[in-house]
Amino acid sequence: MKMEVLSVQNHIQGKFGVNKIKDWPSSGVASTAPHPLEEEEENAVDVNAALDADVVDGHPASVLHMRQHQALNTRSTVPMAPPVAGSGKQSAVAASFDVVNGSSAAYHHAYMTNVLASTAHHPGHGHGPGPSPMPASPLQSTAGARFGAADNMDDVSASAVRDLSQQLQFQLRDAKQRHLACTEVNLPADLTERIAAEIIRMSDREPCGERACTLFIEFESEPNNVRRIASFKVDPDTVSIFELYLTLKQDKSGWTSLLPQFIKNLTRSNTINISPDFTLTKNKLYSSE
């Protein structure tokens, strides 16, 4: 009789998830060895209990999932492993600790952080080195970077560039009054400084530098129409051993270039705009052999 009760009890336990088989005392009835079928049913109950803890506790799966999620969010913070000196790489624990005890927003932030970290550690995805860093945005570019590396003035003296730039401005003002039939001459803001820096570079290997230079300034108003408007020695007390020919070009990209010449003469539109492009040619007055 006890065997049948245990069999029914095991069936109920397997259906509703009770994982502990209670002893059903029976007065006056000796306990007998369990039947092999009963042992299989007990093992099946234990396996089900181990696989599905929700059924054992009597709670639905959603409740246990909520508890597991709460327990995951209340875990203690995993200490960040210090990065290896000089490696510049972040450890896996440090990269993912925000996901362990972060909110929903923190989870997405940490996810993107881990994605970026993984792409940084594997830029080429196993196919060689990754691409070089992208250049700075236009908002971060400097004035020198707009014209390229050749116009970077870090390799020349700032005071020498300033002095030579002032000489160029003085000569251009004088040339406007004497040789250019116009009311105004507009120059790009950094044109004279870039010209001065290039003159210093081209004079770097000369015995006396730019002080032994005679500079000729020419103006090109039309293609194949070049005229000389100024010339001067950088240092009047130094003998010139080489010459530099500077050619400035008229910038005709403005709307005033479309006006007829007689209208320019009648209005204040008679303005010459100098292009930011120029040419500089060197002529040595001595033999280098």
UniProtKB/Swiss-Prot annotation:
Xref: Gene3D superfamilies: RTP801-like
Keyword Acyltransferase: no
Presence of the UniProt keyword Cytoplasm in the record: yes
TM spans (from-to): none
Regulation: induction: By homeobox transcription factors.
Subcellular location field: Cytoplasm
Region Disordered, annotated ranges: 119-142
Keywords carried by this UniProt record: Apoptosis, Cytoplasm, Developmental protein
One GO biological process term: head involution
Main location as per UniProt: cytoplasm
Any one GO CC term of the record: cytoplasm
Record's function text: Inhibits cell growth by regulating the Tor pathway upstream of the Tsc1-Tsc2 complex and downstream of Akt1. Acts as a cell death activator during head development.
Family according to the record: Belongs to the DDIT4 family.
This protein's name: Protein charybde
